[in-house]
């Protein structure tokens, strides 16, 4: 099925028996509806006037139209006299960025309308959705509520792709932490955590939508089609559990990272302490030797113990310095050994 205009609008009439037929405009769609079947209307980035033009023939409520124009709405389902309004989210993950786009659906007795804005990074969304509907031809011909299931199932499949991409990133981060913590960036964990929180929030509300559908809150969804929606609910429940698991994994990775960094800092601190201890030992050993050499270098001392007065004065002085240095070394080593025993 091909869109009737360049990826902004596509109108189809689904006859009671036959393939969906593209129609050029709204007037032609309403004319075709007189022959039975139902209409499938897609609008990407519509203006307010485009939505208000649908208000009269399909009974779109003004509040629902406002929701379509507001990008900050949460997923929900609301029943109006002429239709059921469903707000679902579409996920798209690319270049480590999570895009969440709002998809609004109006389901009536003989029509289904899809409205969406800001198809971030996914301009072919509508074309692929129409291709999917072509593959699900038998379900599409069964009624507008079955087409609603096809659309929602497609949106849930895209959630699976997004969660799969996040899972691959989490696995890569785990390998980085274990193999080479130096190349690991903790901000990657924070980014993934934010993405998972957004996904979890969206899925929480979307599960509530499926709960209301499955308990027959909408009169425009037949009892026979409810079994199809239960399958979507099962998938969302699975994704919800996976997001919780991945959040726990990220928390564990952060604890692991902090623990490894603490160990690394401890090792560096111990290394610094060893260096300082060695320098201190060298300084302590040479302090008395420096004192003796200072005394020995005095002119008065040299006059009293010079070679002409005492031939062995200088050799004896050197031996005394060596004895003092060796004695200082062994005393320091003994004290260090005693400190280690006390610690143990």
Locate the predicted segments by residue.
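Hydrophobic alpha-helical transmembrane segments and their immediately adjacent juxtamembrane loops
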Residues: 237-344
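Peripheral, non-transmembrane regulatory/ligand-interaction domains of membrane transport proteins
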Residues: 1-224, 228-231, 235-245, 304, ...
């Amino acid at each position: 099925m091909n869109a009737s205009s360049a990826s902004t609008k596509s109108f189809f009439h689904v006859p009671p028996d036959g393939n969906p037929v593209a129609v050029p405009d709204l007037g032609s769609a309403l004319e075709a509806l007189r022959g039975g079947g139902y209409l499938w209307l897609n609008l990407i980035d519509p203006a307010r006037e485009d939505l208000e033009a649908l208000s009269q023939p399909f009974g779109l409520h003004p509040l629902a139209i406002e929701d379509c124009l507001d990008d900050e709405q949460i997923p929900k389902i609301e029943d109006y006299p002429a239709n059921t309004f469903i707000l679902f989210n579409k996920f798209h993950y690319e270049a480590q960025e999570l895009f969440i786009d709002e998809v609004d659906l109006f389901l009536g007795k003989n029509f289904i309308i899809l409205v969406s804005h800001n198809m971030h990074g996914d301009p072919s969304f509508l074309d692929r959705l129409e291709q999917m509907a072509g593959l699900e031809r038998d379900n599409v011909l069964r009624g507008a509520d079955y087409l609603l299931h096809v659309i929602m199932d497609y949106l849930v499949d895209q959630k699976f792709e997004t969660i799969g991409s996040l899972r691959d990133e989490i696995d890569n981060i785990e390998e980085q932490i274990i193999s080479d913590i130096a190349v690991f960036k903790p901000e990657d964990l924070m980014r993934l955590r934010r993405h998972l929180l957004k996904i979890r929030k969206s899925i929480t509300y979307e599960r509530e939508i499926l709960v209301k559908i499955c308990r027959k809150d909408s009169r425009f969804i037949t009892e026979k089609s409810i079994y199809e929606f239960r399958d979507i609910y099962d998938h969302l429940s699975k994704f919800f559990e996976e997001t919780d698991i991945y959040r726990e994994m990220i928390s564990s990775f952060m604890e692991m990272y902090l623990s490894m960094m603490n160990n690394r800092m401890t090792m560096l601190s111990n290394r610094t302490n060893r260096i300082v201890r060695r320098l201190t030992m060298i300084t302590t050993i040479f302090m008395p030797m420096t004192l003796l050499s200072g005394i020995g270098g005095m002119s008065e001392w040299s006059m009293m113990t010079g070679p002409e007065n005492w031939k062995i004065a200088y050799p004896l002085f050197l031996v005394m310095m060596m004895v003092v240095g060796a004695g200082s070394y062994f005393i320091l080593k003994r004290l260090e050994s005693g400190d280690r025993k006390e610690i143990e």
